């Protein structure tokens, strides 16, 4: 459903020169699977998510979503995805119902079909109690549910969650993870980007560990623990990053010695 091959994104900076935000990243995600991208802030996770959602164009590499190329078929990609982040804008003057309805119209959904879909979503996400509440009076949890509903309104096969629990209280974050699990059970293809290790441990079928634009390793939790001979996932994560940084320093030392 999602295929990424040697994806690279480079920025030109007048003071620093070229900066590689994403460096030859490759992975695939199947329907009915939650694929976790785990990394610290600045690891390149959001850049990958934005390329997959067609907001950014890759410098090199290939990415397809539901069989559509993110460059050549950008409009089709957008029809097949829903995107949820921690900073999705909510309109202060529109109610929860009006906002989700508006996005359904943007996707060209017929009126009767859209109304049925909204009724289903508002029941599924327990939003009926604030369906007429304007954005300016919503709690953080309410706003996040609206973000999820408008990402799901057109029933896309692929859903992307980019640091979606950031800034949420424990209860709201827990409810969001429950929604993600339900989406997996319904056969959706899901990417879940986070810097919180406990979330990927509890939620994701497979995990890719990112650092400085690269995927250092990927696999199931069992595979990663076996490969690195470490049961403590936090120790595994930081050990992998530490070894990668040491290798980079050794490489730089060798280059400096040659020059």
Question: Model-flagged regions — what are they?
Answer:
Residues 1-4, 10-24, 31, 73-74:
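A short, flexible loop at the N-terminus of ABC-type nucleotide-binding domains that lies
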């Amino acid at each position: 459903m999602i295929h990424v091959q040697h994806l690279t994104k480079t920025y030109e900076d007048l003071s620093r020169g070229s900066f590689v935000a994403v460096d030859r990243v490759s992975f695939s995600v199947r329907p009915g699977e939650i694929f976790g991208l785990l990394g610290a802030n600045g690891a390149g996770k959001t850049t990958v998510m934005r390329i997959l959602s067609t907001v950014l164009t890759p410098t090199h590499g290939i990415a397809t979503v539901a069989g559509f190329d993110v460059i050549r078929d950008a409009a089709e990609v957008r029809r097949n995805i829903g995107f949820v982040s921690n900073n999705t804008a909510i309109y202060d003057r529109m109610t929860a119902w009006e906002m989700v309805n508006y996005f359904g119209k943007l996707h060209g959904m017929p009126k009767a079909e859209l109304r049925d879909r909204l009724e289903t979503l508002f029941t599924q996400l327990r939003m009926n109690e604030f369906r007429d509440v304007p954005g300016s009076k919503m709690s953080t949890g309410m706003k996040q549910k609206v973000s999820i509903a408008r990402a799901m309104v057109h029933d896309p096969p692929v859903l992307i969650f980019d640091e979606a629990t950031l800034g949420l209280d424990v209860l709201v974050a827990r409810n969001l993870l429950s929604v993600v699990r339900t989406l997996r059970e319904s056969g959706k293809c899901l990417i879940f980007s986070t810097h919180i290790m406990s979330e990927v441990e509890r939620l994701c079928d497979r995990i890719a560990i990112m650092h400085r634009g690269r995927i250092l390793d990927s696999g199931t939790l069992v595979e990663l623990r076996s490969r690195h001979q470490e049961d403590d996932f936090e120790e595994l994560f930081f050990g992998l990053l530490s070894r990668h940084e040491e290798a980079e320093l050794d490489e730089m030392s060798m280059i400096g010695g040659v020059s």
